[in-house]
Amino acid sequence: MSVTNLSWLKKKSQSVDITAPGFNPLAGAGKQMPQASKPPAPKTPIIEEEQNNAANSQKHPSRRSELKRFYTIDTGQKKTLDKKDGRRMSFQKPKGTVKYTVESRDSLNSIALKFDTTPNELVQLNKLFSRAVVTGQVLYVPDPEYVSSVESSPSLSPISPLSPTSSEAELEKTTTPDVVHPKEPTPSSAFTAVRPVRVVSSTSEEEEAFTEKFLKINCRYITSSKGTVSGVLLVTPNNIMFDPHKTDPLVQENGCEEYGIMCPMEEVMSAAMYKEILDSKIKESLPIEIDQLSGRDFCHLKKVTRSNTDELDSRIRDAANDSASTAPRSTEESLSEDVFTESELSPVREELISLDELRHDKSSGASSESVQTITQSGVECLAVISEAASTPDHLKSGSGHTANEVGTLSLKTGLNNLEMPTKEGDQAADNLQKISGLKEQSTGIKKDNQDFPLDENSLHQEEVEKESMPCGEAIELKQKQVVDKGKQGREQNQDSETEVEELRKLWKSHSMQQTKQQRETMQQVSQKEIKHKIATADIEGSALLKEKRRHRLHKFLCLRVRKPMRKTFVSQASATMQQYAQRDKKHEYWFAVPQERTDHLYAFFIQWSPETYAEDTGEYTKEPGFIVVKKIEESETNEDSTNEAAAREWEVVSVAEYHRRIDALNTEELRTLCRRLQITTREDINSKQSTPVKADLESESFRPNLSDPSHLLLPDQIIKLTKHLPPRTIGYPWTLVYGTRKHGTSLKTLYRTMTGLDTPVLMVIKDSDWQVFGAFASQPFKVSDGFYGNGETFVFTFCPEFEVFKWTGDNMFFIKGDMDSLAFGGGGGEFALWLDGDLYHGRSHSCKTFGNHTLSKKEDFCIQDIEIWAFK
């Protein structure tokens, strides 16, 4: 008893560590098989107890392994890796993309620019969580050689169509009607079915909605002096940007810096779409392929008209040659078909009526009415025959076709657009001839044994025959008589065969009578038609030419902005300086936009209109928005505005610009009304009285204090110059720091007098022709390795009238000081103003920096006197 209790206690207290590295529950089972062959050994109580413990530990090894698998806590790293690998395997390559490996100096923006796309699109294609990329990373980028198919998703981007999931593909397979329906699933098959793997699509609905928030348009940027380049216009709710194509010849010649521009949307004052460009300077730089129709298209148009007339001539000639055989055969075949009931004919009647209405729209009134009368009467005759022959069983059993097929075959001549093999017509005709006993009457009919559809010539010939029939009314009367006979045949079914025979003879005799007349008239009709078509082709050619000129492939978008657009391929400082240089110019930018994208632009600007948000409050929102300008709001006082309004298709303006135009329009209308009523306003009185006072005040305010009297400038010339000086010079006295009368003619002396000076300087030159001109420098003159200065620099001349030429923004060539020369402006190897080391010889030429003409009378001049003034 004690031994048994002891063994039970040992069994209860003993445990096995299943997590131990040396534990193997199957090891005992594996060793148990070879031990069974050994002879049994004498058992002691201790050995028996150990064997019982081993047997208990081996009873449920599978259960313990399952518990270990489901309840063991691990780190989860392997599971996470497997899940990531599965997701990576299920991510499909988007259509229209290629793999690109990120290089050391690449960024997401540079990659997007390299493949003509946007960074947002790359983020969407590759499912990126940030814009950071690392070297060696593989990205999917748009394939430039990919052509999107019709089945691709209609998104703005030609790439990244939606890829269907595998479950959707399975659903499409099961719902396809052509596939045999599978058997009903059994309960066991429901558990054995493999669960479909979820495939990550290339885009989602949210991302598609995001891509619709901007427009990406391939267009051309038209400049006044730098030509026309092709590129991409990107319009977003915040910015408008144009990126030129690197492959454009002008871009390769001048660089991207000249054509890449960007502007915030809040700076846009108006956006208008024009049919043509009104600015003469812009219009001169417009390429020929955009401005007018090329001569190659006109020659192609002539070839098309000639080919059309030749084709028409051949068709009519072939129809005239075959008129004798085609007309009887077609009419015979149309009546030698199996008969059918009126209920089966009703859908064919409806189809015939609709086709006759369509033909009535295409052809003239008289000819279409005759064709319609003949075809409808023919249908009535067929209906009578079918009703008369519907009772006998041997007639019903003689048909080898369905009702729809027979209806299509019998209406071949009336519809003029269906194709019918002659073999089927022969079978139907033979069946009807066997039934009615009319074989001997049809021996003279010629029929072919080959299967061929009705060609275009025969269809055209049949249509000409029907239009040229002079006895349509007689045919209608004869067919009415046949209709009356058919009504009597309803009561007497045995007379149906006789009526079929009479109707066959009627059509055959009529067609034979018409053959001679048609042969004679076909030649006249063909000649008249050829002459008419040639004249029509010439008229259509000229009309098409005018129509193509009026509706060109391109229309012109004009953007007017408050400040000049910033260059995107230059540094921030250079872009700011260029904006400052163009501050006094008219800020208009022209783009040649494809005609099909004009509506997209209009809809985009209308989408950001503030009207929907301002209706309830009655106040205009501060958010940037646009308002459509109506033509009745435009001023029509002068001819220029009328021409502009006629050429403009639509225009949207900002809220501020809209109110400014309304105020200006109201003010102008009020002034016009006052002039018409001869009413003097207070503004007119004040303007008349204060004109001399204001002139005196302006002259006093702009007249500076000079340290020394000037020998080169007159007082009025000083005032004119002062108005164009930068604001930082206003209020400072003019100090003479160098003059040839005081310091001599030496460039080195000039540099020495400028030492330690930190103000702008004004150089005035008088040449041997007594002409005064000069330059304003933003910094004192000095010896430099390259050009220096900023956009405040300009050149001027009083020869013959006062003109100022400020920085154009084309380049940064302002001032260049050498030991033997001093130059202003540059570009193309020419300087706006150049002086030698002795300050005796000089040269002036037009340059790109200032856009000036020659400042002196002659390009080469001799210096008579020089004055340099500083502002301190």
From Swiss-Prot:
Residues annotated with Phosphothreonine modification: T118, T341
Gene3D superfamilies: LysM domain
SMART domains in UniProt: LysM, TLDc
Phosphoserine: residues carrying this PTM: S90, S201, S202, S204, S294, S334, S336, S346, S496
InterPro entries assigned to the protein according to its UniProt record, in alphabetical order: LysM_dom (IPR018392), LysM_dom_sf (IPR036779), TLDc_dom (IPR006571)
Coiled coil: none
Residue ranges with Low complexity bias: 150-168
Any one GO BP annotation for this protein: response to oxidative stress
Domain GRAM: start-end pairs: 212-268
Region (Disordered): 1-86, 150-187, 314-338
GO cellular component: a single term: mitochondrion
Domain LysM: 98-141
Residues of the TLDc domain: 711-872
Subcellular location: Mitochondrion
Protein name: Oxidation resistance protein 1
Source species of the chain: Bos taurus
Lineage: Eukaryota, Metazoa, Chordata, Craniata, Vertebrata
This protein's encoding gene: OXR1
